[in-house]
């Protein structure tokens, strides 16, 4: 069972998340990047992450919801919105403008050719989702403080019911992404719930309570891949308790990396998680398809894709930090 670094007292689950949000987000971002890679599908470890790596999104949203509550506690609602806007808008627009320029130079963004969607990065469902979640978070927080369990239950029930409504639209229309947003809303609200009502069970107990749900989620994905069952409307709800176990596994992974003096790798991925999300798929696809890289082997393309994604993420943050320091809105 994890313990605090400075004493022998047992680390609570909320302390584990509060102290480890950066490296846990790093775990989530690595899972997302492995899920989206398609360079080395013949290797079992790569195939595993293509099956299960999408849970990185769930882990990321749980941590985001948890962090949003602390932001709302410290700031007025107005300042909260200002802080969210400063974090999202400049980064998304700078990355979008760079993608547009690269697109005009022959590096293609295959997911959209709509200039507005490309520049704002709203064509990426996750960016659209966090914009929606951050917008409604103060209202959800208001209800969670008063009716915590009831609010979470209502959100979960409405999410399941809304999944029964078919939504079909052109990918360039934002309505086409509402299904993704609706499905992941409960995990975001669950993160907020944990911050409002800290879990009182031990970390060990939480791990074992969430493990069956994680294993069941894995089994359902395997069955779906084998073609033995249809998508269940409540499947994403299984990931609420499962995500708690994933947080603890991420913490143990971090401790392993710390033991071999490599823990800063997770912190780097976590620190630049937004920028990495904005860039990695664009870079993956162009490295795989561009004629300049056609003679490279697939493993080399994968390593190059990750390295270039990290470089672009770092440069994007560096540019934003420079511009914000010299801009009136950044002061």
What is the role of each PLM region?
Residues 1-162, 204-206, 260, 267-272, ...:
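Membrane-cytosol interface segments of multi-pass membrane proteins
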Residues 42-48, 115-120, 167-178, 224-234:
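Membrane-interface helix caps and helix-loop-helix hairpins in membrane proteins
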Residues 9, 178-185, 199-275, 282-287, ...:
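Alpha-helical transmembrane segments and terminal signal-anchor/GPI-anchor hydrophobic tails
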Residues 151-197:
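Loop-centered beta-sheet repeat module
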Residues 36, 277-280:
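Histidine-centered divalent metal-coordination motifs
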Residues 135, 139, 189, 193, ...:
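Specific aromatic-rich, kink-prone transmembrane helix
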Residues 12, 36, 73-75, 141-145, ...:
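Long, hydrophilic "mature protein body" segments
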């Amino acid at each position: 069972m994890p313990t605090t670094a400075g004493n022998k007292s047992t680390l609570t689950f909320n302390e584990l998340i509060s102290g480890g949000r950066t490296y846990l987000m790093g775990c989530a971002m690595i899972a997302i990047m492995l899920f989206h890679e398609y360079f080395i599908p013949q290797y079992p470890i790569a195939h595993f992450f293509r099956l299960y790596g999408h849970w990185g999104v769930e882990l990321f949203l749980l941590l985001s919801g948890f962090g949003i509550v602390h932001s709302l506690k410290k700031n007025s609602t107005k300042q909260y919105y200002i802080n969210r806007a400063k974090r999202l808008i400049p980064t998304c627009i700078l990355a979008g403008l760079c993608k547009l320029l690269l697109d005009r130079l022959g590096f293609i963004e295959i997911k959209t050719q709509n200039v507005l969607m490309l520049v704002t990065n709203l064509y990426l469902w996750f960016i659209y989702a966090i914009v929606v979640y951050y917008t409604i978070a103060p209202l959800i927080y208001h209800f969670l403080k008063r009716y915590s369990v009831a609010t979470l239950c209502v959100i979960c029930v409405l999410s399941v019911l809304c999944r029964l409504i078919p939504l079909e639209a052109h990918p360039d229309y934002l309505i086409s992404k509402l299904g993704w947003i609706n499905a992941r809303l409960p995990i975001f609200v669950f993160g907020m719930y944990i911050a409002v009502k800290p879990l009182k069970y031990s970390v060990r107990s939480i791990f074992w309570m969430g493990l069956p749900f994680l294993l069941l989620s894995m089994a359902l994905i395997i069955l779906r891949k084998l073609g033995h069952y249809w998508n269940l409307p409540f499947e994403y709800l299984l990931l609420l308790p499962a995500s708690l176990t994933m947080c603890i596994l991420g913490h143990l992974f971090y401790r392993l990396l710390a033991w071999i003096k490599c823990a800063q790798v997770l912190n780097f991925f976590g620190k630049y998680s937004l920028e990495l999300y904005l860039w990695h798929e664009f870079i993956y696809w162009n490295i795989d398809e561009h004629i300049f890289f056609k003679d490279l082997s697939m493993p080399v393309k994968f390593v190059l894709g990750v390295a270039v994604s990290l470089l672009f993420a770092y440069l994007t943050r560096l540019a934003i930090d420079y511009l914000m320091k010299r801009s009136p809105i950044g002061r």
